[in-house]
Amino acid sequence: DNAMTDNVITRLLPDGSPDGEMKPMGYIADDLVADGTAEERGHMFFSNTDGNVNVGVWQCTPCTEEAIDYPFDQCCFVLDGTMTITDESGHTETYTAGDAYVIPRGFKGHFKMTGDYKNYFITVEPETKG
């Protein structure tokens, strides 16, 4: 099981699982890549029992992603590379190793990843009713 749900503390490792394995991931839809190629790899360390909170490590090749209606709230801690985020009003912030940021659900703008970008992430998806 690659996502722990037991009632134990889990150490986050920058290279993924304890054996250093990171698997292909596909968070970025091809039609949202505005520049470059999004080759994603990562590892999920934790998913809660409701399935709406996930914690992992994620890396991506240099590219620019368009965010139309970001699907979840997300907190990121940058491990490597650079992330430049521009919101729909044109405000830009740049994050490098050691920085952390939060993306709210519904965000509209662009994410530009420079270098082999890598971060830890926590996502919280909206709870589904009924």
Features from the language model and the residues they span:
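A short, N-terminal "cap"/entry segment at the start of jelly-roll beta-barrel domains
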Residues: 1-52
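Conserved short histidine dyad/triad with adjacent acidic residue
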Residues: 43, 47, 51-70, 104-105
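Short, conserved beta-strand element in jelly-roll/cupin
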Residues: 60, 70-85
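Short acidic-glycine-tyrosine-enriched beta hairpin
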Residues: 89-105
